[in-house]
Amino acid sequence: MKIKIGNILKNVVILVIFSLFISKINSEVVKPNPAKPDELVIAFMSPYFDPEYTQYSGAAEYALSKFNETFKTKYSKTIKLHTFTDTNDVIDSLDLVTMPVNGIVGPAYSGSSSTACLVFGAFAVPSISFYATGASLSNSGSYPYFQRVMPDDRLQVQAILSLLKKNGWTRVSCIHTNEDYGNGGADQLVQQSNAQGITVNTNQAIDPVDNGIAPEQLYYDIVFDNLEAAKSRVIVLYALFPPDCLEIWKQAKARGFLGEGFTWIVTDGCAELTGGTDPDLLGVLATFPSYGLGTEAYTDFERTIVNDYNNNTGDAFYKGASFSYDATYAMLMGIEAVLAKGGDPWDGEQVRTELRNLKFNGITGTIAFDKNTGDRLYGEFALLNLINSTKGSFDPIGKINPDSGEITLKSDILYSGPTYKVPSDYQVVVFDRTLNIVLGVITGVCVLIVIGIGSVIALQWRKFRYSSPLFCMFIIIGALMGLASVFTLLPTPTTPLCSGFPWLLGLGYVIVFGTLFTKTWRTWRLFSNARKFKIIRITNKFIITLVGGFVLLESIFMIIWTAVDRPIPLAEPIFKAGEAQLQCTSDSEAWWYVFVFYKVFYILFGVFLAFKTRNVVDSLNESKPITLALYNLTFVMVVAIALGFILRDNPIAIIVIQTIAILLGFTVTVSVLFLPKVWMILSGQQHSMDSIGTSMDSMGRSNGNTTEAESTRGYTNKDYNNQSVGRSFSAHATGFKDVAPSNHPQLGIVYTGGDNFPRVGSSQTAASRSEAEINVSKDVLAKANKKNEEEFGEFFLKPSEDNILKKKKKKKNNNK
């Protein structure tokens, strides 16, 4: 009920006067004598205007009926129950203690108890509250004669936090009614949440509904404006009565805070709800101290209360009646224990002592009191769920042990939506469809560019002969796989898409850069051995095997990752402002770190190869495009990772950065490697990319006029530009008297030492000679060239026509 300023001032004045009176008599309070020596009096104190009052008082009368015969026959005592309303806590409590009474069941709620029990304690009258949960009542110095059968706010908050931790929620908002119960519960929630690493991002108070009159709209607007600013998704509602909750939910529906994505958890104040018939309330959760549901004793008790005692609520049963019964039953057991020991039932200290020694099974479970504070021990909470809007009340679906945090469910939890999927405690960001379409179109353009380059390579295969067109196509295929990974990022994440993204991106990366660097490694190895006049055999089959090894290693890692900790879509909190993005997540982030950082090996290896092949002849030299590709890849990784941390609060920026990083990483790499060559072919500037032959001189050279350093280094661009060396030479050319050529049956003529190769004039080339002079079948020569090219790729040195002619002449002379 709404607290009036006048009542507050009046109560303060009365308490001050009463405190002065208590201090003067030095705690020696003389209680009035009972009206009848053989009569015992139990007082029941609860707000008369509550709809639950008739059931609460009826439950107390029912408990009393269990003891009437025992007290009469065994102790010659009669016991009476006087009911009082707590319209004015101080005045009503003073009236009670001056009746006098042996004990008091009540007051019902924390606000009344916090005042009335001060008076009860001063007059040494034991009391048992059946619905007060305020944590301040546990202060034994202020409330020495206070007991309660309802678990306190501390335990209820522990039960709520157990539910939060079970669902992985770390952010919660709180709304509470502005009175003792709501204020105390909210304070406990904030204190215990902070201690357990759960953030209460906003704590909002609203006055309770007073006789059907709700607070002004302005105050509700303030509450929900703050909830919106905090991007609240999980909301704990500490409200005094169901009408308070219904009014707040009415406002929440108008502001869009009901439905899928929002979780409401109410406490015992609203767990008595009977009017939750709005379908939008489906999925609301409640915690309520266990009240015996499911036991035979509870079933009989509920039937009795509804049918036999004052009940103006139809067939509805209020859970608090179970606690009213247990509180009354405990008070009578304490008084009986005093009588059984020959004690004085009017001695409040004796009654309190026996109460705190009790342990029995009540309707709500095991009843026992803390010997120092009088708090209920063995408290257990029922987890309630609103799953039937026609019924309009909560149904129990499980139990929560607040001490251990254990939650036992007998059915799945229905969340708002309704859905059985656990919602996020963050505002889940849904990316703009228009943005996704734009990113998809850009990715599609990049895919077409790569496909176009690949088509030119396939159609102009021989013109890319010295670039190993087979491996060029491997690079194209890998780039397409990497670009395809973008299309797994744009739709709403699903488990197959989450698993497909690292597979496509990882294999695409390995194929592109594994092929590029392996092919370049072959160039380096061949030319580094050429300066030593060594012939090494590195076939295409060997290169394919190396690339396959890289792919196999990547596949093994991905298989283990997928089997052990497969990425799944979760709404992960990645933004400081209370937002989250539905993203693919594994239990351990170590998988992603390994996935990203071990690929740095490829970058380092690429830098090494680019440096080593910087002086190779132009037709085989890819150091410059590799350097550009590496620079681009390094830049993209560094900038993308840095921006990813800086812009974590911007969900749109995150997806854009991821997409652009992938597009630049693959599209630019393919472009710098192949686009210049493709352009030269398409524009007609160059008819063949292999017009400049690979001569035998590329294996190394030496003559008497060179220095030792020159004779041991590989063949360079400078050497190539200073000499025009054809594909073949004549053994009779001038200056070749010391040449010792080796006629390899597959490699052709290989220079193994001697003077420099001569500058072969145009008149000496094979193109200028007549077919009669060469006298070699072109078909035979073409077949030989094709066979060796397939095995040795661009490093095959064709058998020279001069050599073939020379061998034929030599054979003829030998025959003669």
UniProtKB/Swiss-Prot annotation:
<feature type="topological domain" description="Cytoplasmic">
    <location>
        <begin position="518"/>
        <end position="541"/>
    </location>
</feature>
<feature type="signal peptide">
    <location>
        <begin position="1"/>
        <end position="27"/>
    </location>
</feature>
<feature type="region of interest" description="Disordered">
    <location>
        <begin position="697"/>
        <end position="718"/>
    </location>
</feature>
<keyword id="KW-0472">Membrane</keyword>
<dbReference type="GO" id="GO:1901261">
    <property type="term" value="P:regulation of sorocarp spore cell differentiation"/>
</dbReference>
<dbReference type="InterPro" id="IPR002455">
    <property type="entry name" value="GPCR3_GABA-B"/>
</dbReference>
<keyword id="KW-0297">G-protein coupled receptor</keyword>
<feature type="transmembrane region" description="Helical; Name=5">
    <location>
        <begin position="591"/>
        <end position="611"/>
    </location>
</feature>
<keyword id="KW-0145">Chemotaxis</keyword>
<feature type="topological domain" description="Extracellular">
    <location>
        <begin position="491"/>
        <end position="496"/>
    </location>
</feature>
<feature type="topological domain" description="Extracellular">
    <location>
        <begin position="647"/>
        <end position="653"/>
    </location>
</feature>
<keyword id="KW-0732">Signal</keyword>
<feature type="glycosylation site" description="N-linked (GlcNAc...) asparagine">
    <location>
        <position position="68"/>
    </location>
</feature>
<keyword id="KW-0807">Transducer</keyword>
<protein>
    <recommendedName>
        <fullName>Metabotropic glutamate receptor-like protein E</fullName>
    </recommendedName>
</protein>
<dbReference type="GO" id="GO:0038039">
    <property type="term" value="C:G protein-coupled receptor heterodimeric complex"/>
</dbReference>
<dbReference type="GO" id="GO:0007214">
    <property type="term" value="P:gamma-aminobutyric acid signaling pathway"/>
</dbReference>
<feature type="transmembrane region" description="Helical; Name=6">
    <location>
        <begin position="626"/>
        <end position="646"/>
    </location>
</feature>
<feature type="transmembrane region" description="Helical; Name=4">
    <location>
        <begin position="542"/>
        <end position="562"/>
    </location>
</feature>
<dbReference type="Pfam" id="PF00003">
    <property type="entry name" value="7tm_3"/>
</dbReference>
<keyword id="KW-1133">Transmembrane helix</keyword>
<feature type="topological domain" description="Cytoplasmic">
    <location>
        <begin position="612"/>
        <end position="625"/>
    </location>
</feature>
<comment type="function">
    <text>May be involved in early development in cAMP sensing and subsequent chemotactic response. Probable receptor of GABA and glutamate, leading respectively to the induction or inhibition of SDF-2 formation.</text>
</comment>
<dbReference type="InterPro" id="IPR028082">
    <property type="entry name" value="Peripla_BP_I"/>
</dbReference>
<feature type="topological domain" description="Extracellular">
    <location>
        <begin position="28"/>
        <end position="436"/>
    </location>
</feature>
<feature type="transmembrane region" description="Helical; Name=2">
    <location>
        <begin position="470"/>
        <end position="490"/>
    </location>
</feature>
<dbReference type="InterPro" id="IPR017978">
    <property type="entry name" value="GPCR_3_C"/>
</dbReference>
<feature type="topological domain" description="Cytoplasmic">
    <location>
        <begin position="458"/>
        <end position="469"/>
    </location>
</feature>
<dbReference type="GO" id="GO:0043327">
    <property type="term" value="P:chemotaxis to cAMP"/>
</dbReference>
<dbReference type="GO" id="GO:0016595">
    <property type="term" value="F:glutamate binding"/>
</dbReference>
<feature type="glycosylation site" description="N-linked (GlcNAc...) asparagine">
    <location>
        <position position="388"/>
    </location>
</feature>
<dbReference type="GO" id="GO:0005886">
    <property type="term" value="C:plasma membrane"/>
</dbReference>
<dbReference type="GO" id="GO:0031152">
    <property type="term" value="P:aggregation involved in sorocarp development"/>
</dbReference>
<dbReference type="Pfam" id="PF01094">
    <property type="entry name" value="ANF_receptor"/>
</dbReference>
<feature type="transmembrane region" description="Helical; Name=1">
    <location>
        <begin position="437"/>
        <end position="457"/>
    </location>
</feature>
<comment type="similarity">
    <text>Belongs to the G-protein coupled receptor 3 family.</text>
</comment>
<keyword id="KW-0675">Receptor</keyword>
<feature type="topological domain" description="Extracellular">
    <location>
        <begin position="563"/>
        <end position="590"/>
    </location>
</feature>
<keyword id="KW-0325">Glycoprotein</keyword>
<feature type="glycosylation site" description="N-linked (GlcNAc...) asparagine">
    <location>
        <position position="311"/>
    </location>
</feature>
<dbReference type="InterPro" id="IPR001828">
    <property type="entry name" value="ANF_lig-bd_rcpt"/>
</dbReference>
<keyword id="KW-0812">Transmembrane</keyword>
